[in-house]
């Protein structure tokens, strides 16, 4: 991609993903659905724990934020594995997360090939 497109479109959009999902998650709440006087149906919004995030090689920084932002905004921790064709993107995102105040261990970056590292994450 041309550098001007990356600087003027992709990076700002990636940043916006964090703002967007932070705002959306603040609006989420559990809902109750009446069934009858003996039952209660409800939704519960809570973190699921550790999320394995595998992101492709195309527009890697922005696609990584599509996965990382909602994961962290909902209170989960993440293990991010980028394509072996764009590994530095994940490293930089991890550095930026630390600079932004996200505690160490909340966003974890692993490197490797899909057949080994990616496969281990999804099993």
Residue ranges: model-predicted function:
Residues 2-3, 104:
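Residue-level detector of short coil/turn "hinge" positions at structural boundaries
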Residues 3-28:
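Long amphipathic alpha-helix in the N-terminal Rossmann-like dinucleotide-binding domain
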Residues 17-20, 29-123:
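Rossmann-like NAD(P) dinucleotide-binding subdomain of oxidoreductase/dehydrogenase enzymes
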């Amino acid at each position: 991609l041309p550098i001007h497109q990356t600087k003027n479109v992709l990076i700002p959009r990636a940043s916006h993903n964090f703002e967007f999902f932070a705002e959306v998650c603040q609006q989420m709440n559990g809902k109750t659905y009446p069934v009858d006087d003996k039952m209660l149906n409800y939704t519960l919004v809570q973190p699921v724990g550790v999320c394995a995030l595998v992101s492709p090689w195309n527009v890697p920084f922005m696609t990584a934020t599509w996965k990382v932002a909602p994961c962290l905004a909902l209170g989960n921790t993440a293990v991010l594995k980028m394509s072996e064709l764009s590994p530095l993107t994940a490293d930089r995102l991890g550095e930026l997360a630390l600079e932004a105040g996200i505690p160490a261990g909340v966003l974890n970056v692993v490197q490797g090939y899909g057949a080994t590292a990616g496969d281990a994450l999804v099993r």
